[in-house]
Amino acid sequence: MSDNSQKKVIVGMSGGVDSSVSAYLLQQQGYQVAGLFMKNWEEDDDEEYCSAATDLADAQSVCDKLGIELHTVNFAAEYWDNVFEHFLAEYRAGRTPNPDILCNKEIKFKAFLEFAAEDLNADYIATGHYVRRRDINGKSQLLRGLDNNKDQSYFLYTLSHQQIAQSLFPVGELEKPEVRRIAEKIGLVTAKKKDSTGICFIGERKFRDFLGRYLPAKPGPIMTVDGESLGEHQGLMYHTLGQRKGLGIGGTKEGSEEPWYVIDKDVQNNILIVAQGHEHPRLMSTGLIAQQLYWVDRQTLTEKIHCVVKTRYRQQDIPCSVTPISEDKIEVHFANPVAAVTPGQSAVFYQGEVCLGGGVIEQRLQE
């Protein structure tokens, strides 16, 4: 085993079980470990949302238990400027962004990485992400996490091999139940804490209410493909392609009991377009165009490749071909049609366990 005792690692402590166990595992591996709690959101109002205070207390408790220092830093300005403003702009444009991807790109693996290296003299940062790193020929690769159910490489595809080389992912080698077992065994307060599902750093808010604070909702018609009006939506931003729940329209058309699905948004005219059945042709795509590309090895794609893609988190791998249109634009064709390919979300590419990178879906391609 290489001597890690001279190497300093700063663990991004979220107050959750994954980062807690990451800190412990790194300690076991002999590193000099300290924690860092990032405050990335200022408006921590009323009791329902006071999760940040609880998270900080939990992170502190874990660090005390492990006998390591916990630093805190406020990245709220960076988060607002580089993540949240973009998030709102995408919703305004009728797209459905993924703030976690942007947050990893701008905060956890940029602001945090720089702060740890420059202010805390760290050799590495570490996070509780379920991904793995492999170094080949002097370049770091991003691999899927060992626990297929928890793999988070989809959210980290913008990282470069240099950023990965400066990062450690201890729980990526484990399955989630094992992580909880370790936390319980060593008596960490976070052992039974449930996984967070809120928007990145904003916590478990009621999403519709939260979005409504920053973007005025514009109600408009819900229409079928044939132009028949079925009711009113409260704002296109509250709906995403393939959505079934929360449309407020029931049941039958010409005797069909099939549920209604969002199959398109007409942003220009503020119309939500719906159809019955989740395999409606308008919901299916044969491919997509993506831009804002990030390849982990930072090499530009110059020729067609065959690989697999995910167009959303936890989706089954989809075999596809990827053809470069320009340096920052690709055309992707799926082996079989895929439902609910959503502009604003990311398409992330893999060969085997290796995450190649990805880009933001600009448009879906249909027959």
Swiss-Prot record:
Keyword field contains Transcription = no
Residues annotated as binding ATP are 12-19, 38, 128
Q: Which Pfam families match?
A: tRNA_Me_trans, tRNA_Me_trans_C, tRNA_Me_trans_M
Q: List the disulfide bonds.
A: 103-200
According to UniProt, where does the site described as Interaction with tRNA lie?
129, 345
In residue numbers, the region (Interaction with target base in tRNA) covers 98-100
Give a GO biological-process term: tRNA wobble position uridine thiolation
Which chemical reaction does it catalyze? S-sulfanyl-L-cysteinyl-[protein] + uridine(34) in tRNA + AH2 + ATP = 2-thiouridine(34) in tRNA + L-cysteinyl-[protein] + A + AMP + diphosphate + H(+)
Does this UniProt record's set of keywords contain Transferase?
Answer: yes
What GO cellular component entries does it have? cytoplasm
Q: Catalytic site residues? A: 103, 200
InterPro entries linked: MnmA-like, MnmA-like_C, MnmA-like_central, MnmA-like_central_sf, Rossmann-like_a/b/a_fold
What GO annotations for molecular function exist for this entry? ATP binding; tRNA binding; tRNA-uridine 2-sulfurtransferase activity
Which segments carry the region annotation Interaction with tRNA? 150-152, 312-313
Q: Which UniProt keywords apply?
A: ATP-binding, Cytoplasm, Disulfide bond, Nucleotide-binding, RNA-binding, Transferase, tRNA processing, tRNA-binding
Cellular compartments annotated: Cytoplasm
Enzyme Commission no: 2.8.1.13
Q: How does it assemble?
A: Interacts with TusE.
Describe the task this protein carries out.
Catalyzes the 2-thiolation of uridine at the wobble position (U34) of tRNA(Lys), tRNA(Glu) and tRNA(Gln), leading to the formation of s(2)U34, the first step of tRNA-mnm(5)s(2)U34 synthesis. Sulfur is provided by IscS, via a sulfur-relay system. Binds ATP and its substrate tRNAs.
Q: Which NCBIfam families match?
A: PRK00143.1 (NF001138), trmU (TIGR00420)
Q: Which family does it belong to?
A: Belongs to the MnmA/TRMU family.
Q: Which named protein is this? A: tRNA-specific 2-thiouridylase MnmA
Species annotation? Photorhabdus laumondii subsp. laumondii (strain DSM 15139 / CIP 105565 / TT01)
Q: Which gene encodes it?
A: mnmA
